[in-house]
Amino acid sequence: MKKKGFIIGGICLAAIVGILGYNHEAVRVVFHNVYSPSVKLDDSSKWNGGKAYEKLPYSETSENDYLDLYVPDSEEPMPLIILVHGGGFVYNDSQSRQAQLMYRYFRDHGYACASVNYRLAQEAAFPAGVEDVKSAIRFLRANAEKYGYDPERFAIWGESAGG
């Protein structure tokens, strides 16, 4: 019994030391050097037709609280697909390659698309990024009529930290 307590205590102590010793700047530098895409998709892969709203602010909390919104031409409000980028809360942004591929696919299938940017760990501690995404969704719901998509038909997805 003492052995189990010792092991569990050691694991907890290691976790606490790891959390206290976590260096956001070191992680950002490492990931930035690893994730430096040299290939950008051409403009036709991003959006073609309809309206594009890039770096649309959804909150005044941070200059990083913006989203990119793409709405195809349509007589009727269409569903909105929301992408939340990944990156372990330390890198990436709303204009990632995955977002560009999403725009290409969904524009051809009659969906509006939004890609949400949020504060990363270097700027604000968790759960700031999650709170930012909630703010973005409230903004998108409140402005659905203005931008021409249906506030009752949202889908949200993401990868890694965005999932």
What are the language-model segments listed below?
Residues 125-145:
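Alpha/beta-hydrolase active-site loop
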